[in-house]
Amino acid sequence: MTLLQALILAIVQGITEPFPVSSLGHAVLLPALLHWDLDEHAPMFLPFLTMLHVGTLVALAGVFWRDWMAILGGMFGRYGSYRQMEAIRIFGLLVIATIPAVLVGWLLEHRLRAVFGTPLAVAGFLILNGFLLMVTEWLRRQKGHRDHKPIATLAPKDAVIIGIWQCLALLPGLSRSGATMNGGLLRGLDHETAARFSLLMAQPIVLAATVREAWQMRHMTISHDIMVQCVAGAVVAGLTALICSLVMLRFFRNHDGWALTPFGVYCVLAGLFAGAVILL
């Protein structure tokens, strides 16, 4: 992998991690479409992947540091206060929503990616991701959801349902953030709140993936060239994810009636284009 390829992958990771368009799907399709000879299973690719996760994790933590301070500070605040009860409830909802994907991922993640990780399959799932985003918008309009329901008002059942939606992202091409936003919207959240809950959910999962990858490469010797790619990739992915997260939250705040639709259209068109190129 060249430095230019590393930077392009970092930019794509930073853009697609917060947006509901599947970061994993783009990571599979882009090298295939550009005919890059990359072996993502090579030992030297793991440090690069880990540092991309570190970059996006730091970016997301930077965007949502006030949320985490409110949650963690509230949990250890004055005993029995409303702020403490609300913080404990939100933290509990995040834990509940994370459990389904952790369990299913532990059992099936590698098998699903081995079976459905081909570029053509990913293109198909990217098209499906787009349709799911657009169908969710249509269903939400049919139900007349125009309220601004806070995260703390979700029931544990709502968190479980959002967590089940997240399991779809184990299929390459289906977006994790898109799936959880779909679940949040259908449980009564507005677009900005659904995105906020989705990206708060993402951070423990990205952290767990980073720790796992770091453990796997604990005995690895990393060359200077790979280290340069890793550091550059982390910085670029982090800055890109930071900007895109802020842009996305603002966009969702100002376009609550149809915010997922453009992403849905993009996924369908991108999937069709990628599938056509692969087949031809």
UniProtKB/Swiss-Prot annotation:
Q: Where in the cell is it found?
A: Cell inner membrane
Name of the featured protein: Undecaprenyl-diphosphatase
Taxonomic lineage from the root: Bacteria, Pseudomonadati, Pseudomonadota, Alphaproteobacteria, Acetobacterales
Hey, which family's this protein in?
Belongs to the UppP family.
> HAMAP family given for it?
Undec_diphosphatase (MF_01006)
Which organism was this protein described from?
Gluconobacter oxydans (strain 621H) (Gluconobacter suboxydans)
User: Which reaction does this enzyme catalyse, per its entry?
Assistant: di-trans,octa-cis-undecaprenyl diphosphate + H2O = di-trans,octa-cis-undecaprenyl phosphate + phosphate + H(+)
Q: What GO CC annotations are associated with the protein?
A: plasma membrane
The residues that cross the membrane are 1-21, 45-65, 90-110, 115-135, 151-171, 226-246, 260-280
Query: Which gene is annotated as encoding this protein in its UniProt record?
Result: uppP
